[in-house]
Each structure stands twice: as C-alpha cells, then as structure tokens.
C-alpha cells in the first residue's frame, strides 16, 4: 500500500507557497527529520548572506508576498536578523518553523519586533519522555514548551506542529488537550514522510488509516467553540474529509505553480517532497548561481514531466525502508 495518496500541501489559490530551508544545521538530530539536519553539520550556511538577501529582494517583483523559513533550525542561522529585516522592509511576510529550543524571552521579543507573522513550534507528544526520545535530547520537551510560552507572552502568533507516530495515535485527544492547556491558538498534525532520517526509522511512520482524518475532524469540531484551531495534512488517504475552514489538498499538482521550495544548499524545486525523493530530477537551479527569476523560467519543462493530477504523483510509491 502506498505511503502517500494525496498531496500534503495546502497552497494558496493564487500566488506561491514558498518554503525555504535556510540551514541544515540544527541543535537536534530528530529521528523523523526529513532533511537529515544535525548538530554535526557545519554551522556556516551554504547560501551566503549576500545570496540570501538577493533572493529576498527578488520576491516582490515575482508576486511572492510571504515565505516560510525552516531548516535545520532557522533560529541558529547567524544572519537571520538581517534576512528578517529586509523581508520586513519589502513587505514580505515571514513564517518560521522551529523546534523551539533556542527561544528565550529576549529572542521571542525580537521575533515580535521583526514582525514575524507566525512561529510554528514542533511538539511531538504531550509526554516529555516520548518527545525527548524522538528529538534525541533530554531537554527538548521542556525547551519547546518554554519557547511556546515565551512566544505567547511576547505576543508572537504561535502554532504547534505535531508528528503523529504510532505511539501518539491512541493519545491524540490527550495531546490536543495538553496543547490547549498551554493556550496555543493553532495546532497542525501531520504524519512522518519516509525521506531523510525518517526513511531509516520506519517505526515512526504509521500505516495509512482512512479513519484518522475523520477522528481529527471530530476533535477539531470539539474545540471549535473554544480552544485551538486544529488542522491536519496527513499525506495519506483522508477519506474525502475536509473540515470547515481547511483548504483542501489540491486535485491538480501545484509543484512549481503554487508551491516553491528552496533547499539549504540553494537548490530550487517545485516541491520539497519531490526534491527529497530525487534531487537530480527535480532541481530547477540554484540561487547561489542564478536569480530566482531565471530559475522559474524552467518550471514549464519540469511540469511537463509530472502528471497533471496528484493521483499520479511519484511520491505515491514511496515506502519506508524496512529494518
């Protein structure tokens, strides 16, 4: 049975969803990391400050009004304040995905001052032991929770992101209740996709469950009157479920047309998952050698090699490696 049957992305109806992995360096080495990020990698970013600033300068003319920065751990990129400053000056909205570990009160206040639109903090369990095991760090849970609280205190919009593992599956209600108790207004749940380190840890990838989306939608409606807004993007068969207010997965492939991805080495692709599956095939160019404007001229040729609908996506045949 295929691991992925529907697109995981919820791209905007117009414009692009730009996801930029600004570094592969990370203070953690999570068992399910799709980028194989690690503290053993070099801390100096592969994309220089000059190249990064040049890229951001191009975005308004391309009609790209926001971007999501991830990693690795984006808060550990030394020049991040300069990137945020330029983005703010140009009116490019910034969303940030982080493990929460580096967030102190001072850093949370700096993120608010920089105008970051939302910080998504990863929390994979309401149980410290389980989260720390996945994140491979005995302090990961406490630091993530501290990061959540500091962002909330500073007035930074916060979302919690959780990866549904087989262990978390029977405890989803307790998990959502815990996050709600922290005062978090938004929660998004996903399943691990078998690329990167997750491909070598198949026990973290649950079997497709047609009833999971319905269960999550039940939780979503339970909290609709008060509590966190719950969303999910499972990448597995969601059984046609599409809770009110949740943008449906695209029926047609959005790679390169409404989705753009930039890897930590500067490679540009139309879809992060396709790129991680086969970088050579899906690489459009590299921002250290070409402008994004020039790179995007290659999208039509890439699109010609892909099926029009998501049913024929190359990712549908990806399976987790067996031990």
Per-segment meaning from a language model:
Residues 42, 113-114, 122-124, 129-255, ...:
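Radical SAM enzyme [4Fe-4S]-AdoMet core and its adjacent flexible, acidic
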Residues 1-14, 248-250, 267-323:
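Flexible mid-to-C-terminal extensions adjoining Fe-S/redox cofactors in radical SAM and related proteins
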Residues 77, 104-105, 169-172, 269-270:
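Short, well-ordered alpha-helical microsegments
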Residues 25, 29, 36, 256, ...:
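Cys/His-rich metal-chelating microdomains
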Residues 1-114, 118:
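Conserved alpha-helical substructure of the radical SAM core
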Residues 92, 259-260:
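Generic short beta-strand
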């Amino acid at each position: 049975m295929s691991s992925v049957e529907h697109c995981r992305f919820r791209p905007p109806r117009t414009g692009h969803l730009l996801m930029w992995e600004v570094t592969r360096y990370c203070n953690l080495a999570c068992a399910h990391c799709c980028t194989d990020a690690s503290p053993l990698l070099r801390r100096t970013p592969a994309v220089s400050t000059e190249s990064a600033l040049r890229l951001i300068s191009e975005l308004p003319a391309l009609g790209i009004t926001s971007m999501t920065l991830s990693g690795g751990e984006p808060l550990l990129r030394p020049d991040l304040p300069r990137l945020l400053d330029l983005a703010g000056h140009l009116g490019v909205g910034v969303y940030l995905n982080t493990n929460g570990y580096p967030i102190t009160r001072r850093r949370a206040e700096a993120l608010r001052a920089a105008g970051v639109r939302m910080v998504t903090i990863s929390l994979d369990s309401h149980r410290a032991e389980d989260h720390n095991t996945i994140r491979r760090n005995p302090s990961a849970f406490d630091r993530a929770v501290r990061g959540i609280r500091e962002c909330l205190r500073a007035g930074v919009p916060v979302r919690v992101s959780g990866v549904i593992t087989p262990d978390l599956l029977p405890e989803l209600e307790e998990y959502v209740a815990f996050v709600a108790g922290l005062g978090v207004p938004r929660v998004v749940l996903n399943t691990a996709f078998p690329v990167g380190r997750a491909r070598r840890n198949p026990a973290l990838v649950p079997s497709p469950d047609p009833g999971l989306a319905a269960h999550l939608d039940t939780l979503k409606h339970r909290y609709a009157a008060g509590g966190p807004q719950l969303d999910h993007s499972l990448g597995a068969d969601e059984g046609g479920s599409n809770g009110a207010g949740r943008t449906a997965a695209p029926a047609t492939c959005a790679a390169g047309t409404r989705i753009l991805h930039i890897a930590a080495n500067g490679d540009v692709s139309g879809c992060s998952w396709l790129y991680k599956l086969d970088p050579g095939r899906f690489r459009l160019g590299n921002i250290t050698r070409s402008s994004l404007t020039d790179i995007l001229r290659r999208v039509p040729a890439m699109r010609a090699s892909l099926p029009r609908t998501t049913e024929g996506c190359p990712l549908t045949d990806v399976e987790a490696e067996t031990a």
